[in-house]
Amino acid sequence: MGEVSELWKITAFRRLLIARVVSNIGNGITPIALAFGVLSIPGADAGSLSYVTTAQMIPLVLFMLVGGVAADRFGRSQLVGITDIVGSIFVGISALSFLTSHASIPLLCFNGFIFGMLNALWYPAFSGIMPIIVPAKLLQAANSTVGLAANAGFTVGASIAGVLVSTAG
């Protein structure tokens, strides 16, 4: 427990931990809400959902190496922050399209593709952040604390999505 209290003294670690929890709440909501949302579009079916999810996965695979280079060339922290914020904007656009009854498979595929590209930049940048912000002796505790908190955030997000889908449709 001493290591965790040492971690809390590091401002950059606290910010990263809070950001991961908040972001992962959204990451828990998104796939569930998106699946139900896509299937609610008139004429959409399981194939439509597969197009949307594939549109997100293809750039993730294609651009991961670019993400590694970008993480090395530009600041990892800045890249993580920017990609998280821009990704949230595209998820918000998708959510707004559902709320205003303007959602379409092409729009969701486009947004998914952009989100996948952003994730391809995010993952390599995030994987190298921890050694930059915490001392080596606290690295294991930092990684496990952020991992646990991020998973808790994802679980909370998935639970929120379940409530939203069951009550709001």
Could you tell me what each predicted segment is?
Residues 1-169:
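Alpha-helical transmembrane-bundle signature of multi-pass membrane transport and export proteins
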